[in-house]
Amino acid sequence: MHTDISSRFNYERLFRFVLPSVVMMIFISTYTMADGFFVSNYVGKTAFTAVNLIFPAIMVFACVGFMFGSGGSALVAKTMGEGQMEKANRLFSLIVLSALAGGILLSALGYFLMPFLAASMDASGEVLACSVFYGRTLLLSLPMFVLQRVFQSFMVTAGKPSLGLRMTILSGVTNIGLDALFILVFKWGLLGAGLATVLCEYAGGLFPLIYFLKRNTSSLQLVNPEWDGSALWKTCTNGSSELLTNISMSFVSMLYNYQLISIAGTDGVAAFGVIMYVAFFFEAIYIGYSMGTAPIVSYNYGARRDDELRSIFRKSLTVIAGTGLFLTTSAYLAAPVLADIFVGYDETLATLTVRGFRFFSFSFLLNGFCMYGSAFFTALNNGFISSVISLLQSVVFQIIAVIALPLWLGTDGIWLSVSIAKLLAFFVTVSFWIACRKEYHYA
């Protein structure tokens, strides 16, 4: 049965529609975890620490893709809901071209700033050298990474979430296969890990670009773009919450790494790296669900179908509550096994990782509501509220927690910081839902 964003959704149809986006994000997190697994177990703890130290800095430059993807897809989906298909294609083309240009400029800027960024996180010696080398290697494919993130959002808007999944799987299999080839067979070490990621991102960015350039069966087509400064500004402001979320997550990760080096040494950074790999896998479910439902919300808002908007909102809260309970329980119980996969070769590091992950696991209980809340308001084209939620949960609350809690609890305070921040953000999100329900008619 064909399902697109204009359909009426029961739970079965909703799950079927968002499943490709959820699986896609899980798969992305899986091959990201594969990078960590190969580097940690076959290149060494120093390289693993370096990768985790510099990766947040790389993501600062890549975040423009999330902004253009989420903000642009919301605007295009709303335009489609209003029945203006030709305008939707022109906007889509302008957004893709702008994202590519931004990725190229940021790649060049990042190359020159990389040594300063690594040094600012208190890296020194071999860790510093490895961080700069790995960071500059990954910047070679930054424009393609940006495009990949943009197309992930637009595949859903175009009514082709399953195609986005297939392209992601192709990209992921490429990365895992090349990791094994370059690291295990060719013995290229950190260079091999970086090149595997670069080639994977080129595959993930070029294939959807070619698809939309050719005649296709989706709802969208790349055409000659027409400059529309106001629409581009709307895309950037509407997607600013996702930009803020991802930039802030990167800067907060840098702050975590700085605190951990000061309190627990390089083992703390390595343990935090393991926790982040696994957390991304768990949070990928929330990200994929939010990404999958956002075009549905935007379409129904644009088409003024309040009854369907209310239905999607209520169903989503139920799904997120059940998922949060399941993920929190699973994370707590599986912590020893997950730590052993990445750092089983070092008993002290594994013990530190298990303790940290069990404190961290409580954040999954409420994190889904915060993520969905931000994405929901973006889909309603209210970038301001979405940005406030993102800024508070990802920056303000976490910075306060990671600075204050270690003063009383030491390293445990660092592990608890995310959970405390998500609890505070949950109350903010619920407050906005209650305050805006009459304006948008979703409750």
Residues covered by each model-derived region:
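Small-residue-rich hydrophobic transmembrane alpha-helices
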Residues: 48-108, 145-164, 271-335, 367-389
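Short alpha-helical transmembrane segments in multi-pass integral membrane proteins
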Residues: 1-18, 76-141, 185-240, 297-363, ...
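Helix-terminus/linker motif at the lipid-water interface of multi-pass membrane proteins
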Residues: 30-49, 118-125, 181-188, 250-281, ...
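Transmembrane helical elements of multi-pass membrane transporters/channels
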Residues: 16-35, 137, 171, 200-204, ...
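N-terminal transmembrane alpha-helices
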Residues: 6-43, 56-71, 75, 100-107, ...
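Transmembrane alpha-helix boundary and packing residues in multipass membrane permease domains
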Residues: 21, 25, 37, 41, ...
